[in-house]
Every structure is written in C-alpha cells, then in structure tokens.
Amino acid sequence: MKEFAPAVVLVLNSLVWFALFTQTLGTLIDRTVPMPTENVLLHGIYYGGIALGAILGAFVFPRRRENYLLYWMLMGSIVTTASLLINSEQLYLDAIVLIAAGMSVGLGLPSSLAYFADTTAVENRGTYGGITWSTVGFGILAFALALTSMDLPTTFLALAVWRVTGLLLFFILTRLRGKLELPPSKPRYGAILRRRDVTLYLLPWIMFSLINFTEAPILVKVFGESQELIGVVEFAITGIFATVGGIMGDLVGRKRVVIAGFMILGIEYAVLSLFSSFTASWYIYTLFDGIAWGLFASVFFMTLWGDLAETNQKEKFYVLGGLPYLLAGFLPVLVKPFLGKIETATAFSIASFFLFIAVLPLIYAPETLPEKKIKERELRDYVEKAKKTKDKYV
C-alpha cells in the first residue's frame, strides 16, 4: 500500500480537479462570453490547450516525472485562480488564460495515469484502478455537492486549494516511498499506432467518446429538470461498479468487461430511442449508464493502456487513449446550437447502432491480461474449492 499511496493521491486529486475545473470554467465562459462565435472559439482554445499539453507532457515528463508532476500541480492551482481574469472585453487575455488552463490539464494527466500503471502489477491493475476510480467518482460527487452553495470565484479558489493540498500530500508520500524507476523503452507514436492490438481497442474507444459527448446535450433536453438528480444517482452507481469492473477485469480479463460495457450502452440507448417519453426508461438508462461508466472507468480509462504499454514508458499510450475522451468534451458546445433540429429518437437509435458496431473490433482484439495470470487464478480457485469440498466430507 505504501508503494501505491502516492498514485492514489495523484490520480484522485488530478481527476477530481479536472472534472470540476472544466465544468466550472465552461460555466464561466458561457456566462461571460455568450456570443456564439466567441463562445465556441474560447471553448475550442481550452480543448486545444489540453491536446497540446498532453502531447508535450508525454515527451518531457518522463525525464523527471515526479518533480514535473509537482510543478504541474502547482501550475494547476495558479491557473485555476487566474481563470477569474476571463471577461467579455479582453478576448486576447481570455485566449491566453484558456490555453494555459488547457495545458495545465493536459501536461500531466498522461504521466499521472502512467505513474499509476507503473506502481501496479498487471494482475492487480484492474482492481486498483477500480478502487481508485470509485474514490474519484464519490470524490467528484461530494465536492460538487459542496460547491453548489458557492459562487464562481469561491469555487475556483476552493479548487485551487484542493490542488495545492494534493501537491503537498503527493510530495510527502513520494519522499516516504522513494523514487520510482521508469521503463527505459520510449516508443514512437507511429510505432504504437501500427500495433494491431492498440488499434482494435482505440477505435471503439474513439467511437464511444464521440457518441457519449454528442448525445450529452440531447439527454439534457430529454431529462430536463431531472438531469441533475439523474447525474448524481449515476455517479453513485459508477462509483460502485468501477470497483466491480476492476475486480472482474482481473478475474476474467479486460476484453470481456469492455465488451459487456458496450453491450449495456447499446441497450440503454435502444430503450431511450423507443421509450424516451416514459419515465421508466430514464431509470433503466441511469442504471445501465452508471454500470457501463463504472466498467469503462476502471478498465478502459485506468487499466487498458498501461497493459498495452507492457514494459515501455506508458505516457504516450495514455495520450492516445486519453485524448479522444478529453477532446470529445468539446462536442456538446458544437451540438447545442442545433438541438432544435435534432430528432431525439433518431439520435438515440444511431447511437445504439454504432455502440453495437463498436463491439466488432473488440471481438478480434487480444486479451491484455496475460493468459497465464487468468489460468493461475482459475487454478487457485479450483484448489480452494477442492479443499472446501474435502473438508466438508472429512
């Protein structure tokens, strides 16, 4: 646990901060710069900064990872506070602040997840990833509920304090644990993308990210005032099933868990496409979406890219796996102006169709949990059952 504690603090602090900072920053942009063109431009600058930061960070951070992660967390706290400078009269200043904000997210996220992967063994990575994401999910939920009574300036200051707190804890824990040695191999992006196993997992993940964020504004339109409550319940379900998904990923393999997640998503959107006017379909959607997100968070987001990296440095794998999800967050901004022209049932039907189609590459994808580890677990379970049977009749 001593080895793993710094990774938990780092990932928990970073992902909670990222989720709430992005949401709060988006609210500030929408309130301050309501003009459609400028609004889309500023959102785009922020997400562009994330992409630029992630690509740059994957090259730079492995050289002195722990030190750079500390600098990154300090940068995050400063930029969080500086976001209050955004206003409708100085768009150039807004652009500078937002590209800095995007880079303050992107620079260290791949290294944070790579750090997590390097502190876990492949046979336990899913379980640890699930437990970590459960903590993240409940952390976001608790923090978000606490922030509801705060105005935007106070929210930004609270997030800055949260970031500094994580920095101090990570600094102390890394000094207690000692330096973590990095894998020596540094693969190129081209070599990674030419790998068949990476492509077969990356394509469905891209498809999921596009569908998820494209459908998000449509779901808000359908659920109306119930959206906030549904989001809270879904976060709680995700928090529970992240741990379940992680444990299952270590027991039966990552591939089966991921395929199950896509099947669940396909079913929930099919239900909405047929019965979105019935409240019961909302309950089904909330339950299924929470389960699917739990499975994906622990396995697809936290575990899979570390598995695929094997003995290589893992930052670039997490960049390729993380960017589709991070950049797809820009899609709701583009979709909102066209909500009135979108037929809800058609949108949900298309989403369901492509989510089922996304399973096809996964069928041909290799299992990333070594077969030997699965056999060892099965043999261990068989021996334990045999002992219990023997004790029962002796």
State each model region's role:
Residues 1, 175-204, 377-394:
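Juxtamembrane intracellular "pre-TM" segments in multi-pass secondary transporters
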Residues 75-90, 263-277:
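C-terminal ends and interior cores of transmembrane alpha-helices
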Residues 1-51, 196-230:
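Helix-loop boundary and gating motifs at the non-cytosolic
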Residues 52-67, 241-254:
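Helix-to-loop junctions at the C-terminal end of transmembrane segments
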Residues 311-340:
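A late C-terminal transmembrane helix in Major Facilitator Superfamily
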Residues 155-175, 345-364:
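Symmetry-related core transmembrane helices of the 12-TM Major Facilitator Superfamily/SLC fold
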Residues 255-299:
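C-terminal transmembrane helical hairpin of 12-TM major facilitator-type secondary transporters
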Residues 107-120, 295-310:
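Intracellular juxtamembrane helix-capping segments at the cytosolic ends
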